[in-house]
């Protein structure tokens, strides 16, 4: 993947403003609410019976932070995302058996959450750069499945 200097700047500039625990929790909760079939991968998280329960669930919030922290690793390694996510791809494929389509779903929810939190800063150019990034990350996470 080739990143332009502008894309790299847009990604890193916005990322410097991101509240990882909040945005991560909101993105994961959003996916679990909007795509309820994804909840089957989180059966040990306790109460996921409603949007309110999901959004207030401490395990969802903690895992959302963990997920977005890993996403931050992609930003630190934009030129080597595939290798950055090799072990996570293996874990999600071989042990957790996560449908790789879910990586795309979470990426799309993340875009919506970023737009909601960072409105003016989330310009069309920034949106395009982040859309490219979530697609590259989803592809890297799905790599083990191919």
UniProtKB/Swiss-Prot annotation:
Record's signal peptide: none
Pfam families according to UniProt: Globin (PF00042)
Binding site for heme b: 63, 92
Gene3D superfamilies registered for this protein in UniProt: Globins
One annotated GO biological process: hydrogen peroxide catabolic process
CDD domains linked to this entry: Hb-beta-like
GO molecular function: haptoglobin binding; heme binding; metal ion binding; organic acid binding; oxygen binding; oxygen carrier activity; peroxidase activity
Residue ranges of every copy of the Globin domain listed in the record: 2-146
Annotated Gene Ontology cellular component terms: blood microparticle; haptoglobin-hemoglobin complex; hemoglobin complex
Record keywords: Heme, Iron, Metal-binding, Oxygen transport, Transport
Expression sites by tissue: Red blood cells.
Assigned protein family: Belongs to the globin family.
Function: Involved in oxygen transport from the lung to the various peripheral tissues.
Assembly with partners or alone: Heterotetramer of two alpha chains and two beta chains.
Protein name stated in the entry: Hemoglobin subunit beta-2
